[in-house]
Amino acid sequence: MIPLRFYKLQGAGNDFVLLDALAQPLPEHDFASLARRLCDRRFGVGADGLLVVEPSHEADYRMRILNADGSEATMCGNGIRCFARYLWECRCPDAASLAIETGAGVRRVHRLSAERFQVEMGTPKIMPSPPISPSPNELGEAGQQGAPPCTPTPLSHAVGEGLGVRATFVHTGAPHLVLFADSVDAFPLETLGPLLEHAPEFPDRVNVSVAQVDAPNRVRARVWERGAGATLACGTGACAIVVAGAHTGRLERTVQVQMPGGVLEVEWSADDTLWLTGDAVLVFEGVWRATL
């Protein structure tokens, strides 16, 4: 038995277990298995993902992210705020900002108040139309195939006939298939999320974000995250929704995104940089004593 000190944090209800590899020797262990065990809500600590503090040659620190199923993630907008909250709390209380290395590149985080942080999320990429090729029968009334690149395309593969759903494929540090619907509450995300996540057209899997526009600067959303399932919030998903909405004329470039766990603020600035603002709360810390 090797006791591991951990920290439990959450941002807009998206929760994480954090381990500091600089403060304690982490066992030479299968990190995928460790993430699955720590994130288990009945037999572990319980979380959507695992964050690991590691040294970096490119930034102040490196953030390693593993999903609840043990898969590695490149970037997490809520996770990086929680990661930064821990660093300000326990390592660099006087820093004006922090540069954090992620799988998607170095991201800078600014502390606005004790529990509120702003992340420079980088430049989004609006990908070619989702590589989903529904049959003519599947298309139904949703539209016609052959939409040009970088525009929303009819999507009914795994969605069903008659929904009229259109999707935009956006990369904001993580790949998101963004769908706009009349009602996020009525949208069958728990059914369609895993089907789209594992669709053969996405060999690396994909996150699924569904949004309901309430106003040009306000949207309600839910996200199915690859490797974690339905979560209370998703930072890269909020960014992807704003990019897709602005790109298709539904939204302005500064938007409040209401997710089940709270509100995230996204700005897509004129220089093409995405900014994500939201809370990050250190909930508790403890020692995990389970046998590895």
Language model regions located:
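Ligand-binding beta-strand-loop-alpha-helix segment within the catalytic cores
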Residues: 125
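Ser/Thr/Pro/Gly-rich low-complexity, intrinsically disordered segments
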Residues: 132-140, 154-156
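Selected transmembrane alpha-helices and immediately adjacent juxtamembrane segments
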Residues: 166-167, 175-178
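Glycine-biased, low-complexity coil/linker segments
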Residues: 139-142, 160-162
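Low-complexity, intrinsically disordered or signal/transmembrane-proximal segments
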Residues: 144-145, 157
